[in-house]
Curated annotation (Swiss-Prot):
It is a multi-pass membrane protein. GO terms for biological process: acyl-CoA metabolic process; CDP-diacylglycerol biosynthetic process; diacylglycerol metabolic process; fatty acid metabolic process; glandular epithelial cell maturation; lactation; lipid biosynthetic process; mammary gland development. The keyword Acyltransferase applies. One of its GO terms (molecular function) is glycerol-3-phosphate O-acyltransferase activity. This is Glycerol-3-phosphate acyltransferase 4. Highly expressed in testis. Belongs to the 1-acyl-sn-glycerol-3-phosphate acyltransferase family. It comes from Mus musculus (Mouse). Keywords: Acyltransferase, Endoplasmic reticulum, Glycoprotein, Lipid biosynthesis, Lipid metabolism, Membrane, Phospholipid biosynthesis, Phospholipid metabolism, Signal, Transferase, Transmembrane, Transmembrane helix. Glycans are attached at residues 247, 327-328, 362. It is found in: Endoplasmic reticulum membrane. Converts glycerol-3-phosphate to 1-acyl-sn-glycerol-3-phosphate (lysophosphatidic acid or LPA) by incorporating an acyl moiety at the sn-1 position of the glycerol backbone. Active against both saturated and unsaturated long-chain fatty acyl-CoAs. Protects cells against lipotoxicity. A motif (HXXXXD motif) lies at residues 248-253. SMART domains: PlsC (SM00563).
Amino acid sequence: MFLLLPFDSLIVNLLGISLTVLFTLLLVFIIVPAIFGVSFGIRKLYMKTLLKIFAWATLRMERGAKERNHQLYKPYTNGIIAKDPTSLEEEIKEIRRSGSSKALDKTPEFELSDIFYFCRKGMETIMDDEVTKRFSAEELESWNLLSRTNYNFQYISLRLTILWGLGVLIRYCFLLPLRIALAFTGIGLLVVGTTMVGYLPNGRFKEFLSKHVHLMCYRICVRALTAIITYHNRKNRPRNGGICVANHTSPIDVIILASDGYYAMVGQVHGGLMGVIQRAMVKACPHVWFERSEVKDRHLVAKRLTEHVQDKSKLPILIFPEGTCINNTSVMMFKKGSFEIGATVYPVAIKYDPQFGDAFWNSSKYGMVTYLLRMMTSWAIVCSVWYLPPMTREKDEDAVQFANRVKSAIARQGGLVDLLWDGGLKREKVKDTFKEEQQKLYSKMIVGNHEDRSRS
């Protein structure tokens, strides 16, 4: 047997006391408040302190750049090309006017100068298109002391470098272990709690317990990300028998919304840890999980969703119609499937503040584990959530028009760019129909004018 020396025994005792104090503080200041949905204001104080530090760091960088006669890097938030919203016909008219005095309606079917319009548009798209930049992290106006968010960082001063190093120590040596412990606590309680609730007979008591177990666990997971969330217009929160649709930036969108409401999730059945969580959750709550073979069957998916929303006693379904993660600067095309069902739609706009950490998941660049590690080593996740008034499909409106109307409302409320492009372009090639659409517009302009002249 090994005998501990007095000094070694002292170290072991101190370590034991430290861990006891740490877990007591964790329980009192984080887990218990999460269970009851209360906050002591520590996270908001932390956020205000960070803002002051960021402001000071930005001033130091600007001063250092001025002393060295260097221009401080500023991202082009509105794109590198100034674009006016004009139609194809108007732009070609302008090109023809600048080349000759002929007007469009007196011009033959085709002019060689028309080529310049398509060449210019092609060059603009290569340099700064609307779609590709939505699939990469949003650039910041000022550095937030995270090396991965600063694309042009150079040594400025000793104090700023020390501050950055201190930030690395705090994030990796204190916040990361704390957040991992909270994440395991939240996930563990979710699996155990929902499994136990699943054995209870169906009824109000089971529903009550299931709701509070879900809320408790999601709130603990929210604290594992140091998420500071502001909810607006809670009177518009989704109700039973409806569909909640939101813009999609990250997998944590689910946790953000589920920590303030009780939803039925929709998704594909997974294996591993995710599969264990899914099987436990579905025992306590009627979530809608699909097998891999069923996901591609659009009619089967629509049928399952319709059956769910027709039962007004069932929870609102949470759906992200974009189908992929966008970098929270815009909202892209909504898939029409969830708008064909005929249920009341509850739009929700989610807007993250990238100053404290980039919530966007670039799935083509980072795996889930790497992404979660980046989240847990960020300063915090700060976001605003707006619950919009419920919307229903109008009589003269098809599913696509309804989806676009909901999308526009979300984009307007969240201060996001409303785009018609499909988020599927993140992984797929541009369809020929997009190219043909431009050809049709041009041919319609030429042939249309020619036919009008023939009739006259």
